[in-house]
Amino acid sequence: MKAKELREKSIEELNTELLNLLREQFNLRMQAASGQLQQSHLLKQVRRDVARVKTLLNEKAGA
């Protein structure tokens, strides 16, 4: 997910995206803990996407 795509979204859409990413992160962590996760790079990717969304939410809240 690109930051440029996220900047075009509203605050409500960003909050929805954040919830979806957190759910996905939880599911990936559970798969990793049970040894079922084949693509371990997804954990890092989702964690960074969460950070991008949170950063944009903070920027929009300050503006």
Swiss-Prot record:
Pfam families per record: Ribosomal_L29
Gene Ontology annotations for the cellular component aspect, listed alphabetically: cytosolic large ribosomal subunit
Keywords linked to the UniProt accession: Ribonucleoprotein, Ribosomal protein
Upper classification of the organism: Bacteria, Pseudomonadati, Pseudomonadota, Gammaproteobacteria, Enterobacterales
GO molecular function: structural constituent of ribosome
Record-level GO BP terms: translation
Organism (species): Shigella flexneri
PANTHER family to which the protein is assigned, alphabetical: 60S RIBOSOMAL PROTEIN L35/50S RIBOSOMAL PROTEIN L29, LARGE RIBOSOMAL SUBUNIT PROTEIN UL29C
Segments traversing the membrane: none
InterPro entries, A to Z: Ribosomal_protein_uL29, Ribosomal_uL29, Ribosomal_uL29_CS, Ribosomal_uL29_sf
Family: Belongs to the universal ribosomal protein uL29 family.
Protein name: Large ribosomal subunit protein uL29
NCBIfam families xref list: L29
